[in-house]
Amino acid sequence: MTTQAIHSVLAMMNITAEQAAGNTLTLSAPATAGAGFMSELNSSIKQINGMQIEARRKAEKFELGVPGIALNDVMVDMQKASLALHLGIQVNNKLINAYQEVMNMAV
């Protein structure tokens, strides 16, 4: 897996997270050398965590009977958070495979 492919996957994760959060789609410029891969990865992990926290909060509010919280909204938010987590796990697996492939290359 090339670095371009990794950046592409991370960009798709960010777009998916933005869409799941209900934000408008914004395409950002490629990360600068200072921002780097690690900051993109941390940002994606924080977005996934934020989605899960928000889904849990909405579920708790629904369980407490707070007006304005519908079951379908709770279920959709929980599915979005679950999907984002599974996507993050798949990206993690791909990164590990890419790392192992690079480490096994003959010099």
UniProtKB/Swiss-Prot annotation:
* Keywords carried by this UniProt record: Bacterial flagellum
Query: A Pfam family this protein belongs to?
Result: FliE
GO CC, sorted alphabetically, is: bacterial-type flagellum basal body
Mind telling me which InterPro entries this protein's record contains? FliE (IPR001624)
Q: Name one GO molecular function term.
A: cytoskeletal motor activity
Q: Which domain of life is it from?
A: Bacteria
Q: Where in the cell is it found?
A: Bacterial flagellum basal body
The Gene Ontology biological process annotation of the record reads:
bacterial-type flagellum-dependent cell motility
Q: Belongs to which family? A: Belongs to the FliE family.
Q: Which NCBIfam families match?
A: fliE (TIGR00205)
- PANTHER family noted in UniProt: FLAGELLAR HOOK-BASAL BODY COMPLEX PROTEIN FLIE, PTHR34653
Its name, as the record gives it, is Flagellar hook-basal body complex protein FliE
Organism, by scientific name, is: Sodalis glossinidius (strain morsitans)
Q: What is the lineage of its organism?
A: Bacteria, Pseudomonadati, Pseudomonadota, Gammaproteobacteria, Enterobacterales
Q: Which gene encodes it?
A: fliE
